Amino acid sequence: MIRVGLILCCIFIVGVFEASSADDILTAHNLIKRSEVKPPSSSEFVGLMGRSEELTRRLIQHPGSMSETSKRGPPKKGDFNPNELKPESNIC
């Protein structure tokens, strides 16, 4: 009976020791993990919905791109005439 109690006590002590060292290992691992990996800043992170907004912004910034030109089609006769622009004489 004493041997069984002694064996159970040893198992309990070893279990407590292993659990505490496992917590230390996890804590050390989490600290290392936090220091190595930087979270993305708000300007770096682009969500799934943000990607379509980013693509739309790019198309607006570059209206003469091939994709926009092909979508618009050929210019119509009455749309824009560069000869109609009058130079302003009041520009300093």
Curated annotation (Swiss-Prot):
Keyword Nucleotide-binding: no
Species this chain originates from: Octopus vulgaris (Common octopus)
Tissue-by-tissue expression: Expressed in the posterior salivary gland and more specifically in the mucus-secreting gland cells.
Keyword Isomerase in annotation: no
Entry superkingdom: Eukaryota
Keywords, in A-Z order: Amidation, Neuropeptide, Secreted, Signal
Summary of the function given for this chain in its UniProt record: Tachykinins are active peptides which excite neurons, evoke behavioral responses, are potent vasodilators and secretagogues, and contract (directly or indirectly) many smooth muscles.
Region described as Disordered: 61-92
Family: Belongs to the tachykinin family.
Protein name: Tachykinin-2
Matches recorded under InterPro entries: Tachy_Neuro_lke_CS
Subcellular location field: Secreted
Prosequence residues removed at maturation: 23-37, 52-92
Gene Ontology cellular component list: extracellular region
Chief place where the protein resides: secreted
Range of residues in the leader sequence: 1-22
Annotated GO biological process: neuropeptide signaling pathway
Modified residues (Methionine amide): M49
